[in-house]
């Protein structure tokens, strides 16, 4: 039975390439993005296009339920969705700063919460959170972006420790 992978932010760039690579390796791949029209090329080669907005809990919940219904399992989660918004901390509206965290941190965290129970039940699984060198270094005019990526690094490290007893 092929392994099943979910890749968020798969409409372009790294997410698209990760989806293509996993598909070539024989995985059943669900490529997720807000706009599935941007996933049409992936669908033509057999990758499942999945509409998912990582700022919308219902969207994420229904996406995971669809994968489980269709395949019975989820083996790999690649949390790749994210973006950078730049400017002086004092100039970025708080709504924009919150949105940066919704996309880069809270969506990633919610997907982990949704898939981890399935992975624990099947006693296997891999979660990869795509971060950035911006999670290790900070530059002026990137405070909100860097803060979100530092949060991804911290969550990933905590998740590694929390799941250590379940790894083989």
Can you annotate each of these PLM segments?
Residues 11-12:
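Conserved glycine-rich cofactor-binding loop
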Residues 49, 92, 100-101:
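A hydrophobic alpha-helix adjacent to the NAD(P)-binding/active-site core of NAD(P)-dependent oxidoreductases
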Residues 52-62, 94-95:
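The beta1-alpha1 cofactor-binding region of Rossmann-like NAD(H)/NADP(H)-dependent oxidoreductases
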Residues 66-79, 85:
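A glycine-rich helix->loop->beta "capping" turn
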Residues 88-89, 96-98:
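Substrate-binding pocket helix/loop in short-chain dehydrogenase/reductase
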Residues 112, 148:
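Active-site helix of classical SDR
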Residues 132:
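Residue(s) in the substrate-gating loop at a strand-loop-helix junction
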């Amino acid at each position: 039975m092929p392994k099943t992978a979910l890749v968020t932010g798969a409409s372009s760039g790294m997410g698209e390439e990760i989806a293509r690579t996993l598909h070539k390796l024989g995985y059943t791949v669900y490529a997720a993005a807000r706009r599935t029209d941007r996933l049409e090329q992936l669908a033509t080669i057999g990758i499942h296009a999945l509409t998912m907005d990582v700022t919308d809990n219902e969207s994420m919940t229904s996406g995971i339920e669809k994968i489980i219904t269709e395949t019975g399992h989820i083996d790999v989660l690649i949390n790749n969705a994210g973006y950078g918004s730049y400017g002086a901390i004092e100039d970025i509206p708080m709504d924009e700063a919150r949105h940066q965290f919704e996309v880069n941190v809270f969506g990633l965290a919610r997907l982990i919460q949704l898939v981890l129970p399935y992975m624990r039940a099947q006693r296997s699984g891999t979660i990869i959170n795509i971060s950035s060198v911006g999670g290790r270094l900070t530059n002026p005019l990137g405070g909100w972006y860097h803060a979100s990526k530092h949060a991804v690094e911290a969550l990933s490290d905590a998740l590694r420790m929390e799941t250590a007893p379940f790894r083989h």
